[in-house]
Amino acid sequence: MQALRVSRALIRSFNTTARNRFQNRVPEKQKLFQEDNDIPLYLKGGIVDNILYRVTMGLCLGGSAYSMYCLGWASFPRN
């Protein structure tokens, strides 16, 4: 019986606290991303998005170059 009360108390606390803890910022983000200001969508999030984009592109280009190097190295085996 006591376990049932404890489980109900835990469920009640999990159900009510998460809803009140965070403020809904979806309308703000929608306005930001729907503006027509000639900025690409992947850069509208600010400086963090810009850094993340550049790091991702750098890693993609580096990985592509390394894979081409490995293919070239494997295509000319040593005797």
From Swiss-Prot:
Residues 1-21 form a transit peptide. Its main location: mitochondrion. Residues 76-79 are mitochondrial intermembrane. The chain crosses the membrane at residues 47-75. Pathway: Energy metabolism; oxidative phosphorylation. GO terms for cellular component: mitochondrial inner membrane; respiratory chain complex IV. Residues 22-46 are mitochondrial matrix. Pfam families: COX7a. InterPro entries: COX7a, Cyt_c_oxidase_su7a_sf, Cytc_oxidase_su7a_met. One of its GO terms (biological process) is regulation of oxidative phosphorylation. Keywords: Membrane, Mitochondrion, Mitochondrion inner membrane, Oxidoreductase, Transit peptide, Transmembrane, Transmembrane helix. Component of the mitochondrial respiratory complex IV (CIV, also named cytochrome c oxidase complex), the last enzyme in the mitochondrial electron transport chain which drives oxidative phosphorylation. The CIV complex is the component of the respiratory chain that catalyzes the reduction of oxygen to water. Acts as an assembly factor that specifically drives the homodimerization of CIV complexes, mediating the formation of mitochondrial respiratory supercomplexes (respirasomes) containing two CIV: supercomplxes with two molecules of CIV show improved activity. This is Cytochrome c oxidase subunit 7A1, mitochondrial.
